Swiss-Prot record:
Record family assignment: Belongs to the acetokinase family.
Cofactor note: Mg(2+). Can also accept Mn(2+).
GO biological process, one term: acetate metabolic process
Complex formation: Homodimer.
Positions bound to ATP: 17, 208-212, 283-285, 331-335
Localization of this protein: Cytoplasm
Protein name: Acetate kinase
Biological source species: Shewanella sp. (strain ANA-3)
Main location: cytoplasm
Source lineage: Bacteria, Pseudomonadati, Pseudomonadota, Gammaproteobacteria, Alteromonadales
Length: 399
């Protein structure tokens, strides 16, 4: 067994994903999810060596109790494995401009994450709860923070500054930050290996497609533009998020239709996207089923989703100058051969030609090139953010 194991924690507002990852291979020794925090039926599910387990956490429990269960029940039952854990790695959604790389957590870092909470009010406070719970449960282990925004700190000003009064950036930090950076970092690195090119000479466009979705232009291993902005709302059509729209729509909804700002925020984040257009579901699998059955709303939602994505991919050839490959990842990107084919068919001007057999084969965790031999390359690479977090954690504690 490797002596480079890391416990990776990803704390949401009402859930906690966890895994024990081998930083050398990326394999998970344990993985699980605690959910429904604050409710009567808080539960935890986990898998060890392929064997599934489930338990109640008790009514109205939360992150602290979940971490204690992981320590006292799950890891206590695997003492040999637990003894090999070298660090706890935390996924942090927003590091603002304060954090350009992963860091070992101390009080200064905790304060910095707190100061970025206004930029990610649903996520950063939950991450802080998880950090404090982990410190209490693992007082002797180093804790490491890995930021979703850090990868995008290499963007030039022309990509991240909004055309608003500059003082809003200077005084309040209002700018494009981007998300999914850990995923885009991983798949762009893996894409260079598939292409058999040095990372420094590889230009790819990565599409991380899930309930949240973003596109990033990666030039020589560095992010040079990305579709999400100050928050995860900007950019692509998503499961329940609207993505790009005319900002005056907000004014119209408030002053002409009587919405409150809170209602508009909720509408754009939780009632829009695939769900809002289809009036059916936010789940892409349900959208594809509706499309196959001829459901008008599902068909329109799918077409808009693919069209917006294709436009972004096309536009990101501008900062790259030369395109080596388009990479699909995330739950939708890895599994929807329908969406991949539709998007690439819209991009035939760039000489994309889908190989139907390869495209259908690249699903359920299988990676590979999905275009014909004479085509510009498009590929599927399953993301592994936990591996990046584990790798960064080991690198930092062994410096």
């Amino acid at each position: 067994m490797s002596n480079k194991l890391v416990l990776v924690l990803n704390c949401g507002s009402s859930s906690l994903k966890f895994a024990v990852i081998d930083a050398q291979t990326g394999d998970d020794q344990i993985s699980g999810l605690a959910e429904c925090f604050g409710l009567e039926d808080s539960r935890i599910k986990w898998k060890i060596n392929g064997e599934k387990h489930e338990s109640s956490l008790g009514a109205f429990t939360a992150h602290r109790e979940a971490v204690e269960f992981i320590v006292n029940k799950i890891l206590a039952g695997q003492p040999e494995l637990a003894a090999q854990i070298q660090a706890v790695g935390h996924r942090i959604v927003h590091g603002g401009e304060k954090f350009t790389r992963s860091v070992i957590i101390d009080e200064h870092v905790i304060k910095g994450i707190e100061e970025c909470s206004s930029l990610a009010p649903l996520h950063n406070p939950a991450h802080l709860i998880g950090i404090r719970a982990a410190i209490a449960s693992f007082p002797k282990l180093p804790q490491v923070a890995v930021f979703d925004t850090a990868f995008h700190q290499s963007m030039p000003e022309r990509a991240y500054i909004y055309a608003l009064p500059y003082k809003l950036y200077r005084e309040h930090g209002i700018r494009r930050y981007g998300m999914h950076g850990t995923s885009h970092l991983f798949v762009s690195r893996e894409a260079a290996k598939v292409l058999n090119k040095p990372l420094e000479e590889t230009n790819v466009i990565c599409a991380h497609l899930g309930n949240g979705a973003s596109v990033t232009a990666v030039k020589g291993g560095k992010s040079v533009d990305t579709s999400m902005g100050l928050t995860p709302l900007e950019g692509l059509v998503m499961g329940t998020r609207c993505g790009d729209l005319d900002p005056s729509i907000i004014y119209h909804l408030v002053h002409q239709l009587g919405y409150t700002l809170e209602e508009v925020n909720n509408l754009m984040n939780k009632q829009s996207g695939l769900l809002g257009i289809s009036e059916l579901t936010n789940d892409c699998r349900g959208i594809e089923e509706g499309y196959a059955d001829g459901h008008k709303g599902a068909t329109l939602a799918l077409e808009i989703f693919c069209y917006r994505l294709a436009k972004y991919i096309a536009s990101y050839t501008v900062p790259l100058g030369r395109l080596d490959a388009v990479v699909f990842t995330g739950g939708i990107g890895e599994n929807s051969d329908i969406i991949r084919e539709k998007v690439l068919n819209m991009l035939q001007i760039f000489n994309f030609h889908v190989d139907s057999e390869r495209n259908k084969a690249a699903r359920f965790g299988k990676k590979g090139i999905i275009t014909t031999d004479n085509s510009t390359v498009a590929m599927v690479i399953p993301t592994n953010e936990e591996w990046v977090i584990a790798e960064d954690s080991i690198k930092l504690i062994t410096k």
